């Protein structure tokens, strides 16, 4: 009995392409995109679906998953994840702007995607992280404080000049340009966000008259306002006609996880090669991007699992976070022990050269020729480097790891 395609598994490739409707007898291509209409797409789905299913089962109720993907399967990945995780648990899509494609045919592709899904979005907390840019301002303030002592006026002037010179780098926190004896702050909004806020009298410290009340009322209860005034956390104008303003302290500045992130794709390769060797692994994950994501969703004691660990960027990132935050975050890496020897036999051009370099590198350290061994060596070297860079704070930092190997069944 015939099926959709002729049930003849011994036919030649050319005959199969004709029989399946991909080419006619004259050799003209009938399918506009062969790779998207056959085994290529099916193989990809067969590979990714069970992994995403297992990942969901392993997530805690408040867990999240980040999946990096390019244009080729982004649309299909979204459909698969909607089915497995539920469209209501789609948390967002991050556009990762990377290095420019120097040889575009039509459109210059400069980005990839990171899809994010929650196990249960309804119970997710708000995602905030300490602002890295705010730390730059704090470091400059401390430098000026060391130089000028308690000369607040000079410190504020110098800090504002520095912020203007670095406006692009400090985008999002450049409004933190006021200084008092407690540190750096910006003036916030005292008005309530909607009508119906608190209304009570606040007397100006110099004129003694009642200060102007916002149309929507104050956003703080009267007791909170009194405490803020007592602690010097309210700015008054020259007289009572100017609205008072709360001081928003630099140390409380938070980042939100934005949907567009710029990352020079070459930086992750440079970082990897500085630790390991040149041209032994293509496109390692960026520890900078991983760190940014983890800062928003990973807490002390959590477990981070990477289903495609590759060069073990996730392990290095977690060890760095543990050193930086004095935390105890754990990681589990999953990687098929892909034979680099087999890759070398079938690869071409740059990929073949990379495989050759990887084989030489693994020979130099006496390890088998697999992707896993590259990742394991990176963990060893990254752990050693972290301890050497910060010997006083990493005495108790655990940089060891165990390996579980699954045999074929």
Where are these regions (language model features)?
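Class I S-adenosyl-L-methionine
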Residues: 1-303, 325-328, 336-344
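Short, internal active-site loops enriched in acidic
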Residues: 71-74, 312, 406-409
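A glycine-rich phosphate-binding loop feature that marks nucleotide/adenosyl-phosphate handling sites
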Residues: 242-250, 309-312, 394-406
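Hydrophobic, well-ordered secondary-structure elements that form the walls
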Residues: 290, 304, 314, 375, ...
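A phosphate-binding catalytic loop at a beta-strand-loop-alpha-helix junction
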Residues: 302-321
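PRPP-dependent phosphoribosyltransferase catalytic core
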Residues: 320-409
């Amino acid at each position: 009995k015939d099926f959709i395609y002729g049930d003849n598994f011994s036919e030649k490739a050319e005959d199969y392409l004709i029989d399946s409707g991909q080419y006619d007898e004259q050799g003209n291509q009938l399918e506009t995109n062969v790779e998207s209409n056959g085994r290529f797409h099916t193989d990809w789905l067969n590979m990714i679906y069970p992994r995403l299913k297992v990942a969901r089962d392993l997530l805690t109720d408040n867990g999240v998953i980040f999946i990096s993907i390019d244009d080729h399967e982004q649309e299909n990945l979204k459909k698969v994840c909607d089915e497995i995780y539920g469209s209501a648990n789609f948390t967002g899509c991050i556009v990762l702007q990377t290095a420019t494609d120097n040889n575009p045919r039509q459109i210059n592709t400069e980005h990839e995607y990171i899809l994010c899904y929650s196990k249960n979005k309804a119970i997710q907390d708000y995602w905030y992280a300490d602002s890295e840019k705010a730390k730059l301002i704090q470091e400059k303030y401390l430098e000026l404080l060391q130089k000028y002592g308690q000369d607040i006026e000079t410190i504020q002037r110098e800090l504002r000049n520095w912020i203007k010179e670095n406006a692009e780098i400090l985008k999002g926190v450049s409004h933190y340009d006021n200084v008092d004896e407690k540190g750096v702050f910006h003036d916030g909004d005292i008005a309530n966000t909607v009508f119906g806020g608190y209304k009570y009298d606040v007397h100006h410290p110099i004129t003694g008259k009642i200060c102007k009340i916002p149309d929507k009322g104050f956003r703080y209860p009267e007791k909170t306002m009194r405490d803020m005034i007592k602690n010097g956390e309210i700015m008054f104008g020259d007289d009572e006609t100017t609205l008072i303003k709360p001081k928003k302290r630099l140390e409380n500045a938070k980042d939100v996880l934005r949907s567009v992130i710029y990352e020079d794709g070459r930086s992750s390769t440079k970082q990897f090669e500085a630790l390991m060797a040149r041209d032994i692994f293509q496109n390692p994950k960026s520890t900078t991007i991983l760190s940014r994501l983890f800062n928003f969703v990973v807490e002390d004691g959590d477990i981070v699992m990477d289903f495609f660990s590759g060069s073990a960027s996730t392990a290095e990132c977690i060890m760095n976070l543990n050193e930086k935050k004095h935390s105890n975050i754990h990681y589990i890496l999953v990687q098929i022990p892909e034979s680099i020897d087999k890759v070398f036999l079938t690869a071409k051009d740059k990929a073949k050269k990379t495989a050759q370099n990887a084989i030489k590198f693994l020979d130099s350290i006496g390890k088998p020729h697999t992707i896993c061994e590259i990742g394991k060596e990176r963990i060893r070297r990254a752990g050693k480097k972290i301890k050497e860079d910060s010997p006083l704070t990493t005495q108790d930092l655990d940089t060891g790891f165990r390996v579980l190997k699954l045999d074929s069944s």
